[in-house]
């Protein structure tokens, strides 16, 4: 007769063998994107078997993240008190985003300096899953030591022209996590809509969040006659911020000023230049640049201070507030006696200096709340604050980046020559009329992959001021997620490698092989990417239409 104690020990031993047994030989090397900084893989040998899942240490808080990531990739997990398969250790020398990863037939060890480093190690792990010789899932033996080249690896969501529902933003965040992006730039206010809830000023969303119509997709000169409105609630904003945080992503909010302010001024007309002829503010129904700018008065600055207070509460994780600062026409300020009086009282020579004065006033509010100002490269016009961070988007003006770096400012590279993903991916004709774009620039994934974020001629001692790079996706002609995905993927994977991988390790042919191995994952997630071979949408039945809001 077998005693109960002996039987329990036997079952536990079998359970341990079942979970911890080495795999059959793993023949396939990882197809990780972005490519790690240093990786040694031993194929043709036994690896770590995933046939029965992974045991995680139940008392380690990192196991919650590991459980989520493994299960999202079809691997079972179990929380155990002893004999865990993954060993987590902390190593501050690896920095905030670096990690070490070792896989043997018996265990997986992850060392990192923070939760973010652990997340990146886990993403490298699940991207390395392959079939062993018997067809079972396994990890090859490997050693990885990795860290990103740049600290800012971003994508932008423009919710003003077309509003992206929270469920879709979460899908975007899931994809960003896989490819080690760490910044979501959320464009929340513009001429065509204000989507950010500000409790003290409810008309910003009830009035500023609604436009009478939009241009027909593919024809900016013709209206569709369909009202369009919407905004996020405070709870939705907090939900997105939390969801992003769990995936190692910081959400940077953008509120446009002093230009691109039509929606705010339509909601509260006293914020505009009320003393000019023909003053009739409204939420704009057409795309492009519009003339309505905030008036540089104390009333406006009190309003902006209130808005910034609420932004800080909604986005506590963000070290920055993005204030736009781009494409601010000066004609209303030139016509406004009030604006001219502000210029005279403050010794400002022209309207460009008035814009700089405006931005410096706002920057002081932001800095006083423990955050930093970031804006588009036009914030340099009239003089740039030494503590501001600048997003460089005008590739046709390379001196802008050089001037900011020479002054000591940090920059993020978002050049429209490479990283405006609303531009057509090319090559090939659009799959259908609704896939047309108004811009015929063909920015292929190869073109994106060829980007060098550090501007040519940058002195070595200034290179650290180049924080990284980001793709911008303006949504005038991108009405919903399937069209957004068609523009963003696979180019986002090329950008992920540009932003992460050491320059000397980049290889376009090798990247293409790894890209092809990523496509089944995108297919499984229902991503409507543009197929790199023929330009067709991956989800041909996806509906590319503007939802009535």
UniProtKB/Swiss-Prot annotation:
InterPro entries associated with the record: Beta_hexosaminidase_sua/sub (IPR025705), Glyco_hydro_20_cat (IPR015883), Glycoside_hydrolase_SF (IPR017853), Hex-like_dom2 (IPR029018), HEX_bac_N (IPR015882)
Gene Ontology CC terms: membrane
Enzyme Commission number, as recorded: 3.2.1.52
A molecular function GO annotation: beta-N-acetylhexosaminidase activity
One Pfam entry name: Glyco_hydro_20b
Region (Disordered): 526-549
GO aspect biological process, one term: polysaccharide catabolic process
Signal peptide interval: 1-28
Keyword tRNA processing included in the entry's annotation: no
Enzyme active site: 190, 260, 327
Keyword Signal: yes
Keywords: Carbohydrate metabolism, Glycosidase, Hydrolase, Polysaccharide degradation, Signal
Alphabetized PANTHER family for the sequence: BETA-HEXOSAMINIDASE, BETA-N-ACETYLHEXOSAMINIDASE
UniProt name for this protein: Beta-hexosaminidase Amuc_0868
Source organism: Akkermansia muciniphila (strain ATCC BAA-835 / DSM 22959 / JCM 33894 / BCRC 81048 / CCUG 64013 / CIP 107961 / Muc)
């Amino acid at each position: 007769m077998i005693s109960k104690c002996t039987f329990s020990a036997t079952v536990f031993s079998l359970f341990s063998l079942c979970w911890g047994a080495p795999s059959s030989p793993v023949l396939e090397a990882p197809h990780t994107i972005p490519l790690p900084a240093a990786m040694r893989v031993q194929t043709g040998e036994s690896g770590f078997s995933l046939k029965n899942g992974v045991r995680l240490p139940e008392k380690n808080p990192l196991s919650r993240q590991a459980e989520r990531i493994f299960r999202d990739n079809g691997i079972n997990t179990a929380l155990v008190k002893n004999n865990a398969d993954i060993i987590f250790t902390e190593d501050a020398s690896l920095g905030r985003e670096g990690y070490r990863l070792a896989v043997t037939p018996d265990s997986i060890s992850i060392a990192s300096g923070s939760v973010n480093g652990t997340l990146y190690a886990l993403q490298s792990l699940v991207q390395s899953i392959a079939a062993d010789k018997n067809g079972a899932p396994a990890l090859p033996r490997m050693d990885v030591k990795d860290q990103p080249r740049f600290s800012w690896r971003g994508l932008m969501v423009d919710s003003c022209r077309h509003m992206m529902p929270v469920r879709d933003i979460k899908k975007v965040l899931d994809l960003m996590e896989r490819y080690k992006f760490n910044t979501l730039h959320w464009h929340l206010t513009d001429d065509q809509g204000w989507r950010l809830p500000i409790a003290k000023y409810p008309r910003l969303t009830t009035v500023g969040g609604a436009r009478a119509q939009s241009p027909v997709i593919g024809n900016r000169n013709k209206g569709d006659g369909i009202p369009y409105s919407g905004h996020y609630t405070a709870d939705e904003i907090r939900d997105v911020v939390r969801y992003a945080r769990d995936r190692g992503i910081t959400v940077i909010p953008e509120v446009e000023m002093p230009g691109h302010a039509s929606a705010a001024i339509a909601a509260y007309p006293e914020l505009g230049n009320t003393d000019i002829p023909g003053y009739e503010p409204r939420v704009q129904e057409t795309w492009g640049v519009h003339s309505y700018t905030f008036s540089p008065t104390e009333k406006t600055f009190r309003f902006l201070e209130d808005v910034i207070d609420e932004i800080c509460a909604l986005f506590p994780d963000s070290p920055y507030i993005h204030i736009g600062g781009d494409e601010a026409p000066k004609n209303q300020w030139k016509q406004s006696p009030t604006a001219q009086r502000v210029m005279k009282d403050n010794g400002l020579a022209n309207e460009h200096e008035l814009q700089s004065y405006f931005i410096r006033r706002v920057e002081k509010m932001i800095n006083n709340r423990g955050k930093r100002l970031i804006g588009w490269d036009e914030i340099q016009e009239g003089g740039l604050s030494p503590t501001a961070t600048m997003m460089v988007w005008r590739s046709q003006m390379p001196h802008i980046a050089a001037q900011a770096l020479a002054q000591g400012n940090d920059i993020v590279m978002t050049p429209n020559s490479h990283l405006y993903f609303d531009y057509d991916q090319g090559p090939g004709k659009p799959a259908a009329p609704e896939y047309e774009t108004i811009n015929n620039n063909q920015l292929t994934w190869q073109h994106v992959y060829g980007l060098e974020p550090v501007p040519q001629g940058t002195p070595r001692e200034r290179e650290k001021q180049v924080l990284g790079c980001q793709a911008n996706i303006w949504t005038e002609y991108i009405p919903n997620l399937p069209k957004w995905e068609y523009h963003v993927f696979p180019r986002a994977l090329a950008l992920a490698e540009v932003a992460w991988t050491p320059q000397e390790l980049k290889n376009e042919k090798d990247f293409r092989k790894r890209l092809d191995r990523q496509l089944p994952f995108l297919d499984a997630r229902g991503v409507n990417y543009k197929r790199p071979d023929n330009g067709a949408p991956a989800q041909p039945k996806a509906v590319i239409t503007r939802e009535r809001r």
